Amino acid sequence: MKNPKDLYLVHLSIHGLIRGENLELGRDADTGGQCKYVVELVKALAKHESVGQVDLFTRRVIDPKVSSDYAQPIEALGNGAFIRRITAGPKRYLRKESLWRHLDAFLDHSLALFRENNRIPDVIHAHYADAGYVGSRLASLLGCPFIFTGHSLGRTKLESFLEKEVNREKVERRYNLPARIEAEELALDSAALVCTSTHQEVEQQYSVYELYAPDRMRVIPPGVDISRFAPPQEKPIPDSVASNIERFLDDTNRPVVLAIARADEKKNLGALVRAFGESEFLRDKANLVLVAGNRNRIADLNPGARKVWTELLQLIDDYDLYGCVSIPKKHEPDDIPAFYRYAASKKGVFVNPALNEPFGLTVIEAAASGLPVLATNDGGPRDILGNCQNGNLIDPRDVPALTRTLGNALSDAEQWESWSSRGLDGVRKHYTWEGHVKRYLEEASGLLEAITQPHLITEKLRTTLPLADRIVFSGLEDDLLESDEAAIAELRELCNANQPNLGFGIATGRSLQMARALIEKHGLPEPDLYITQLGAAIHYGKRLVPDLSWEKHLNHRWEPDAIMEILDLVEGIELQEGPGRQHQFKISYNYQKGVAPRRREIQKLLREHQLPAKVVLSQGSLLDVVPLRSGKGQAIRYVAMRWGIPADKVLFYARRGSDYEALSGQFLAVLGSDHSLELKSTTSLPRVFLASKPNFAGLVEGINAYQFGGGIKVPASAQGLDPDHADEKEAVLAPDMEVHVSDGD
């Protein structure tokens, strides 16, 4: 491990509302236990002697509907820990399903921040699928180890919906599940370690993924801040908390059945009310306390929370639970520990009836408060109760069994005392942040010791093209080369007039030799660099100097011989022959549609053999297999980072589906009037100028529209939809994140 106070760790948690104190847990479906876990982990890591700085990157939100805290670019957490809020998409708050189209902007702004601070992290740790998408690319570009924690996985979510016989297409579109699952697959493949909280996550959730690798899984249970949670005999219960609960109750001396969860269907609070209401014993001898977030008017809640509260109120009325159920409207974050203590003081129990609970932080908090637990048998509570022995697991779908278990738990005083003391001891033994950080840093140390290559982009590296401060990229498609001579001459004149500030680059799927020949044949400007073979190679200048760092970068887990051995057995595809057809980092096949498997099936086949790669189908007849780390967009980001050129000074001429990757971030883009149908959905994106002309005439039109040779200004027609008023439901689905079907170039 590095010297004390040396490690620089970066955590990514993009969605939800995140701040250092007074987290608004339960405000919506995106601001839950994950947010609290990440903030507390970052704070705990910063206290360790081996750590110099920890940054938590999240999305910046400027929205009158939420606190101004979320608009602050930086928030100090103490001991060298910071929250850094990154601009991505519109200013307003967005639910996580609407963030996918803005993740490349988050990536570009994060890269700019690392460049500005002139420091590269030792480890990047991403939380949840959206951060996994960004983090895997950041770590790839920066050359540092990547850790992933999924928290809640898309395949599990999809399965739970399908069990309810919900329309698959509708669910996938609403929750953007194809993009989420693909991001999780790629994060699993890119991660040096996958950090989970429980063995159940590994065995039942991660194991169903194509790129699941058991040897990279690490179960490290998170901790709980024991200074906040304590039994009632050690900390008093504020009068305000007691009165907030008791104002609903007729008899405040009864034992309490407590549930604390956000108002979300997955939390299954309705089942708990049914279990309570079905029992005469519980109705007569106990009180039910439901803490399900804050609310003013139920009508003003988001649709999901409104549906849950409507159901709860109907059930309370159906079972006539008035006087024995408490439903506080508001509470402060600091009230949560007191809710547990209140229930413990009444010899009650805490119930987590969730249909699935990835970890179960509330279960640990209850145990740390001396409150016995009844918790779902689906998820993390299995491990927690196994370690602490302070309660029983329940089947969240079996209401009669839950009724019986509740009655038994509240009727056995000796068992209650045993569970209470075991919970207190178990938490201190298994769930402290000190223990979590110690194990976490031991694993991180192993990753750092395994690094044999320097960072791809080192802190001291500045530039390989000294004078260019902006760059234009174009492809070399056949129809693009049909441009009239006047358009090509104008492009050549424009590039020459703006030297040395303006660089010109080619980004193509063609070989370097063919690209050179076409440029000479058609009289195109002399490129300053070439990105060829779908991003598999980068060369600089007239001498065509190869970028050896990029080659080492692409070589990570690239096994072309093993790939060809597997694909030799696949019917309907055949290796292309001839000069320039094959490349060190691109395997090219002829593809026979109707005979060969679909591209997605070929991708799955390689994954099943633990061969990470991208499978690209072009023109319906050409199939390429390239390293997972390659791609036009990723190569352009690497070049821009290496040269020190900001993303908003990179202009990309897009015409084919394979160009999508370069349109969704902070690059400036020009869309030729003859663009393919795959790019139709991008015309509403910001920084995408729709040219009225085709071919190179469209590129020249775009360069002039952006005033790219001078002060650079995004024209009004390239502002996209008004991001602060556009309906977030109209956000396009993110494309397949590992391949972009194109017409080829």
Q: Where are the predicted features?
A:
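Active-site phosphate-binding/coordination module
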Residues: 487-578, 674
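Mg2+-dependent phosphoryl-transfer enzymes with acidic/Ser/Thr/Gly-rich catalytic loops
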Residues: 626, 633-745
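Catalytic cores of nucleotide-sugar-dependent glycosyltransferases that transfer UDP/GDP/TDP-activated
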Residues: 1-364, 368-452
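Short beta-strand scaffold positions
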Residues: 126, 148, 196-197, 375, ...
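Receiver (REC) domain switch/active-site residues of two-component response regulators
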Residues: 192-193, 528, 667-668
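Conserved acidic, metal-coordinating active-site core of Asp-based
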Residues: 563-665
